[in-house]
Amino acid sequence: MLLLTGATGLVGSAVLRRLTAARVPVRCLVRDPRRLGPERVRVQIALGDLADPPSFRNALRGVTTVVHLAAAIRDQPRGSIEELNGIATWRMVQAAEAAGVRRFVFFSALGASAHDRTRFLRAKALAEQAVLDSDLEHVVMAPSIVYAPGDVFMTLLSRMALSPVVPVSGNGRARYQPIWADDVARCVVALLDAEQPQERYELAGPEVVDYTEITARLLRAAGRPRPLLHVPTPIVSRALRATEAILKSKAPATWDEAELMEVSMVTPRGTADAQLLGVSPGSMAEVLKL
């Protein structure tokens, strides 16, 4: 039995589709099973989430492999970025060890570091360390920015494109190697069959693109190309923090999310790790049919 967290997310939903198609026995840790869509009738359900450590024990019963994709890039009513990423992963690892799990696959991010400027990447570094320090057979998968046609970010950009111009936080020069969610999912599924996997896989697409160009491409893919307006970081920070103070968790965007788009996520390994798993990531032009 495989336990999948984050099954309703961008990568998790793609992984789940591939696992159920391959008839892999899957249990999903979810707060609302309805968000699994049609896949919910093909899997076991364990009610719970990262903010509910007691739910881990039931979810892990009889599990041999954990694929831990769940994450939070903003504070939520049920927990902070640090609690839902770093501390929750540490607790999940402890519960997995107690349950006799064999392999723990953790989904991190390129650039995760205890000294990073962003709270998210610092929390991911804490989570990585908890996994690496465990007695479990462990694998860390660290992708660059992940995208998919119709994902939340593209939907947000489409809404922003109703305006004459689309704002971009800062200078937009942060560099990424964008990788399609389905290519990441293929890597995860391939990893499950690997007898002696590497301890770490850095997943990236075939090209290095800055944030300005990524935004422009996604707008073209949505059929709404627009001029981009670079807004100085201090102005973005003040505006988003003020919005968060008023709207709380309902804010359409947060400073923590915007700040992530000012941090490069690249690897000198390029697509090498994905290819080790038998996956040749497609370019944005190929995937989005630009």
What is the predicted function of each stretch?
Residues T5, L29, L69-A70, F104-L110, ...:
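SDR active-site strand-loop-helix element
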Residues E82-G86, V105, K124:
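Short alpha-helix in the Rossmann-fold core of NAD(P)-dependent oxidoreductases
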Residues S108, Q129-V152, R159:
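Conserved beta-loop-beta element that borders a ligand/cofactor-binding pocket
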Residues R91, V152-F153, G170-D193, E199:
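Substrate-positioning beta->alpha
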